[in-house]
Amino acid sequence: MDNEMTLTFLALSENEALARVAVTGFIAQLDPTIDELSEFKTVVSEAVSNAIIHGYEEDGKGVVTVHAKREDDVVTVSVMHKGIGIEDVSQAMEPLFTTKSVMERSGMGFTIMDSFSDQLTVMSKWREGTTVTFTKKFYTVRTAVM
């Protein structure tokens, strides 16, 4: 393992930016392209937002943990909460499915995460919590300094 980090915070909407910045800083060690950075930042944002919005019935009544691990040029991030969980993971991963339509949620979070990562895994137990894990290999080309 080359490096890893863990960040735990209250399930508050404003902490989504904290998680996004922390993970973006963590992967900056790989010298990613702007596109790679932007896509990965979007995946982190979607996963953390889902954990905050869908994981707990009240803001700040639980915690979200983000764990990132880098091995060579592959980064794996897990976003975990011990809140409500997902009753039907297959249904939740369908495009446009949302349990929060009154909040104008688009239901595209898992679709976006899946399209911007190399691998996406969702493990959930109803009323026990959810772990969303995504992996991305970075293909940056470094030039030698002479």
Swiss-Prot record:
UniProt keyword list: ATP-binding, Kinase, Nucleotide-binding, Serine/threonine-protein kinase, Sporulation, Transferase
UniProt keyword Kinase, yes or no: yes
Gene3D superfamilies membership: Histidine kinase-like ATPase, C-terminal domain (3.30.565.10)
UniProt GO BP: asexual sporulation; negative regulation of sporulation resulting in formation of a cellular spore; sporulation resulting in formation of a cellular spore
UniProt GO molecular function: ATP binding; protein serine kinase activity; protein serine/threonine kinase activity; sigma factor antagonist activity
Record-stated family: Belongs to the anti-sigma-factor family.
Name assigned to this protein: Anti-sigma F factor
